[in-house]
Amino acid sequence: MARKTPIKRYRNIGICAHVDAGKTTTTERILYYTGRSHKMGETHDGASTTDWMEQEQERGITITSAAVTTFWQGMDKQYPEHRINIIDTPGHVDFTIEVERSLRVLDGAVVVFCGSSGVEPQSETVWRQANKYEVPRMVFVNKMDRAGANFMRVVEQIRNRLGATTVPIQLPIGAEDDFEGIVDLLRMKAIYWNEADQGMTYELRDIPESMKAEAEKAREQMIEAAAEANEEYMDKYLEGEELTYEEIKKGLRDRTIANEIVLATCGSAFKNKGVQAVLDAVIEFLPAPDEVKAIRGEVDDEGTEETRPVDDDAPFAALAFKIATDPFVGTLTFFRVYSGKLESGNAVFNSVKGKKERVGRMVQMHANDREEIKEVLAGDIAAAIGLKNVTTGDTLCDENNKIVLERMEFPEPVISVAVEPKSKADQEKMGVALGKLAQEDPSFRVRTDEESGQTIISGMGELHLDIIVDRMRREFKVEANIGKPQVAYRECIRKPVDVEGKFVRQSGGRGQYGHVKVKLEPLPLDDEDGENFIFVNEIVGGVVPKEYIPAVQQGIEEQMQNGCLAGYPLLGIKATLYDGSYHDVDSNEMAFKIAGSMAMKKGALEANPALLEPIMKVEVVTPEDYMGDVVGDLNRRRGLVQGMDEGPAGKVIRAEVPLSEMFGYATDLRSATQGRASYAMEFSRYMEAPSNIAEAIIKKG
């Protein structure tokens, strides 16, 4: 089957923002204008097409990023048909894992900001993630009809707080209630959308007199930015020649794709203004799959890297970036094809798990209706139905051309609660439900507490766990009681020690013999991408046979799960196996595993252990009148205030506070500031807990 849409006309984009910048409404409008959904959904009345889980509609926030395929030919049908795959990403900090996962498979992003509140803490997180994956992006300043909306202020904030070179390609005409349309700086015309047909049509007029000077100045800056794309344009510009319309577009496009500049547009999705122009800008300025850096992957165990071209005839390689459970068809695995093609009924090889699976049916999602497809090609995003062993971040590839596209790193959960089923009948269903949810979301973990026999679930924040329990009730009909949230403490060692672990059992017949000498050293904890555990083998001359060494490592790692102070897992340990002995007959893997865990247990006690607690980065936005109270309260919670800034909504206080002190903070902050302050927090790192706190926890533990 030949390609319907040439690869040059593909755009895989994400729409990202923080909570409430109006991201889902923006996506909704895009679906409306591109003709995929005939009735517009409003997030206010819970009917939006990308928010298809019940809880999302109730809470008005987006949790799972739905991938939607749309087609667009431009506001004036001036382009051949382009295929735009849109991934709507969640903006709530508890779901940053979803955002990270989506950015990974995108070629470009539209970052939505609120015209009045501007850059918020969450926007910084998203921006940082986009930088990490080098995603070219443009900005849409939304809600220009809101009180206090100011386009240029937001553009400045993006420059200062996110360190991006923002280049406006539009200006708003009027603001707040008087927001009428936009000035297109490329065409130097004013665009007014027609309210009678919800913005499907528009008219071009001359720029209002009062704005001509401002528009000229902004256009000059835009042309200068375009001229810096290459020497030819620069020379032309410096000699005072005019750059043509096409040259300006090409200059801006090249620099956007190189991640040198970020183009800024504005509008109000809710009022049907501006989104249409954003779609045109996506086609004009964001890259097609073959214009971004080719994806790299490891092709063997030595870590040899290769790239894969965006080509239908290359070997097949795709990345599974999301698993969702659908009430009608079961498991959906969303994947992005980087190279090659795949027909339904063919087998793919999962190179991370080393397993082969047959792809039965494939669908493309259009918000909430599905279209069955027979074949996917390079650049496509689709979902496969019923793959058994695939988890998020796995690579699907051609069995004869194995490749592992970069593995994703998932954050450690910081908060845990105990859950128990309300009735015996729910017990088994709960196990199945939690297993499925953990498969969908790697930042969510499930374990059974050995002492109490309780099921403990851990995640990235209170909202995250609320939603998990909620989904259990709705999708799997499991009623459960939740305990109080518990902080996920950890333990560490503070000094290096040499320890010996010896396990000998002679009881007639075959005995057991394992003997190891291990050096344990603490690793620095404040490393962003630091390792939690490093195992070094320094055995020479076979004093411990090679086949038993993995067993020693396993014994040490398993023992690290149970600390010696209060039973919390140990972090940040380097273990060096340097000596030991074995017995020809009695030694086996089990004996060495036990010897390893004995050494770890003994060593942890001798190595001056300490308790670690999770520290959160907290940002509070508050009116100036309550600033003293807020800072005082943060100090009472053992917080360290890192700095203060002016924000459009008041003072912004940045602090680091232990998670254990942050429970119920939302309620306390509301009552202290009469509901006028807001806060956001995310995990920063683990730090040693003060001795009085540690003692109390150890007594309890």
Curated annotation (Swiss-Prot):
<dbReference type="InterPro" id="IPR047872">
    <property type="entry name" value="EFG_IV"/>
</dbReference>
<dbReference type="InterPro" id="IPR035647">
    <property type="entry name" value="EFG_III/V"/>
</dbReference>
<dbReference type="InterPro" id="IPR009000">
    <property type="entry name" value="Transl_B-barrel_sf"/>
</dbReference>
<dbReference type="InterPro" id="IPR027417">
    <property type="entry name" value="P-loop_NTPase"/>
</dbReference>
<dbReference type="GO" id="GO:0005525">
    <property type="term" value="F:GTP binding"/>
</dbReference>
<dbReference type="InterPro" id="IPR035649">
    <property type="entry name" value="EFG_V"/>
</dbReference>
<dbReference type="Pfam" id="PF00679">
    <property type="entry name" value="EFG_C"/>
</dbReference>
<comment type="function">
    <text>Catalyzes the GTP-dependent ribosomal translocation step during translation elongation. During this step, the ribosome changes from the pre-translocational (PRE) to the post-translocational (POST) state as the newly formed A-site-bound peptidyl-tRNA and P-site-bound deacylated tRNA move to the P and E sites, respectively. Catalyzes the coordinated movement of the two tRNA molecules, the mRNA and conformational changes in the ribosome.</text>
</comment>
<dbReference type="InterPro" id="IPR014721">
    <property type="entry name" value="Ribsml_uS5_D2-typ_fold_subgr"/>
</dbReference>
<dbReference type="InterPro" id="IPR005225">
    <property type="entry name" value="Small_GTP-bd"/>
</dbReference>
<dbReference type="InterPro" id="IPR000640">
    <property type="entry name" value="EFG_V-like"/>
</dbReference>
<dbReference type="GO" id="GO:0003746">
    <property type="term" value="F:translation elongation factor activity"/>
</dbReference>
<feature type="domain" description="tr-type G">
    <location>
        <begin position="8"/>
        <end position="290"/>
    </location>
</feature>
<dbReference type="InterPro" id="IPR005517">
    <property type="entry name" value="Transl_elong_EFG/EF2_IV"/>
</dbReference>
<dbReference type="Pfam" id="PF00009">
    <property type="entry name" value="GTP_EFTU"/>
</dbReference>
<keyword id="KW-0342">GTP-binding</keyword>
<dbReference type="GO" id="GO:0003924">
    <property type="term" value="F:GTPase activity"/>
</dbReference>
<dbReference type="Pfam" id="PF14492">
    <property type="entry name" value="EFG_III"/>
</dbReference>
<dbReference type="GO" id="GO:0097216">
    <property type="term" value="F:guanosine tetraphosphate binding"/>
</dbReference>
<dbReference type="InterPro" id="IPR000795">
    <property type="entry name" value="T_Tr_GTP-bd_dom"/>
</dbReference>
<feature type="binding site">
    <location>
        <begin position="88"/>
        <end position="92"/>
    </location>
    <ligand>
        <name>GTP</name>
    </ligand>
</feature>
<dbReference type="InterPro" id="IPR031157">
    <property type="entry name" value="G_TR_CS"/>
</dbReference>
<keyword id="KW-0547">Nucleotide-binding</keyword>
<dbReference type="InterPro" id="IPR020568">
    <property type="entry name" value="Ribosomal_Su5_D2-typ_SF"/>
</dbReference>
<dbReference type="Pfam" id="PF03764">
    <property type="entry name" value="EFG_IV"/>
</dbReference>
<dbReference type="InterPro" id="IPR004161">
    <property type="entry name" value="EFTu-like_2"/>
</dbReference>
<feature type="binding site">
    <location>
        <begin position="17"/>
        <end position="24"/>
    </location>
    <ligand>
        <name>GTP</name>
    </ligand>
</feature>
<keyword id="KW-0251">Elongation factor</keyword>
<dbReference type="Pfam" id="PF03144">
    <property type="entry name" value="GTP_EFTU_D2"/>
</dbReference>
<dbReference type="InterPro" id="IPR041095">
    <property type="entry name" value="EFG_II"/>
</dbReference>
<comment type="similarity">
    <text>Belongs to the TRAFAC class translation factor GTPase superfamily. Classic translation factor GTPase family. EF-G/EF-2 subfamily.</text>
</comment>
<keyword id="KW-0963">Cytoplasm</keyword>
<keyword id="KW-0648">Protein biosynthesis</keyword>
<feature type="binding site">
    <location>
        <begin position="142"/>
        <end position="145"/>
    </location>
    <ligand>
        <name>GTP</name>
    </ligand>
</feature>
<protein>
    <recommendedName>
        <fullName>Elongation factor G</fullName>
    </recommendedName>
</protein>
<dbReference type="GO" id="GO:0032790">
    <property type="term" value="P:ribosome disassembly"/>
</dbReference>
<dbReference type="GO" id="GO:0005737">
    <property type="term" value="C:cytoplasm"/>
</dbReference>
<dbReference type="InterPro" id="IPR004540">
    <property type="entry name" value="Transl_elong_EFG/EF2"/>
</dbReference>
<dbReference type="InterPro" id="IPR009022">
    <property type="entry name" value="EFG_III"/>
</dbReference>
